[in-house]
Amino acid sequence: MHVVLAGGGTAGHIEPALALADALRRQDPTVGITALGTERGLETRLVPERGYDLALIPAVPLPRKPTPELITVPGRLRGTIKAAEQILERTKADAVVGFGGYVALPGYLAAKRLGVPIVIHEANARPGLANKIGSRYAAQVAVSTPDSKLRGARYIGIPLRRSIATLDRAAVRPEARAAFGLDPNLPTLLVSGGSQGARRLNEVVQQVAPYLQQAGIQILHAVGPKNEMPQVHQMPGMPPYIPVPYVDRMDLAYAAADMMLCRAGAMTVAELSAVGLPAAYVPLPIGNGEQRLNAQPVVKAGGGLLVDDAELTPEWVQGNVLPVLADPHRLYEMSRAASEFGRRDADDLLVGMVYEAIAARHR
């Protein structure tokens, strides 16, 4: 069996694809896996690092909304679809599993031409254009939110890295806090703005950090590799404020934390919900408002707070985040609400949907 994954561009498209690849290999170590990608996407680094085959096709960016530019897409897609067809034929693909992004639509259209079953996973609450189109031809459609508008969709959550899906935060906490140089007992705020949205969060956290420390809160702050590291003057006897350029073991960061201040990308929301980590979500104010939609269900369930980017200030953090961190019972209740909303088994559920699509083709 050979499965082609179509989900390049950003980590939000690539990580669920790689989680599925890992799950497929756990079930059948002999399964062939090829990921479609473009030269400009993160997949050029992430896919080979995980040991999977990467096949490149030309990038055809899709507009987020219907615009006059949309008319030019079919012409630009032709060569890309042909390249995708050649990859499907070369690998003798049994299924194409798409996650959105630049490479998804060419992958779907190539699969449709060749009669290869299509399985779609949509991570965002508001589906992207590629998955809207691809869902018309798909044998199976999986979504991350229970109220998705994609027809025939099955709610499974988002496939997660195994280190996240199996994380026991309480059991790993002593090791995690020691790894980051944190106090083993103090309430801990984790801060990360992701690859795109760190600057605003960085500014606010650097301003509010002394007030949090005075209140007995320690901070682990992933500043972002492209951002300037803050100058920290640690006062004796104060809880630590630890800025780092990047965290490559997010499972340890989640285990070390009691709460997180972060953006609301679909993958972030899914991971925090799965591990039961309460968060103050600050949706990135770009696109179609999908980040706000991503966070709303878990916030409504009681597992987080939600604040617009323009309203995020040091005063807001003091008035809203600090009271949560200072209240163990409220932290417990928010953690329980988040974990009840989260899903840890989406990778295995999606594997089942891939097998169903392949089996239906041969009936």
Curated annotation (Swiss-Prot):
Pathway(s) annotated for this protein in UniProt:
Cell wall biogenesis; peptidoglycan biosynthesis
Residues that hold UDP-N-acetyl-alpha-D-glucosamine according to the record = T10, A11, G12, N124, R161, S195, Q291
Cell membrane among keywords: yes
> Which superkingdom does the taxonomy of this entry point to?
Bacteria
Q: What's a Pfam family in this record?
A: Glyco_transf_28
**Record family assignment:** Belongs to the glycosyltransferase 28 family. MurG subfamily.
Q: What is this protein called?
A: UDP-N-acetylglucosamine--N-acetylmuramyl-(pentapeptide) pyrophosphoryl-undecaprenol N-acetylglucosamine transferase
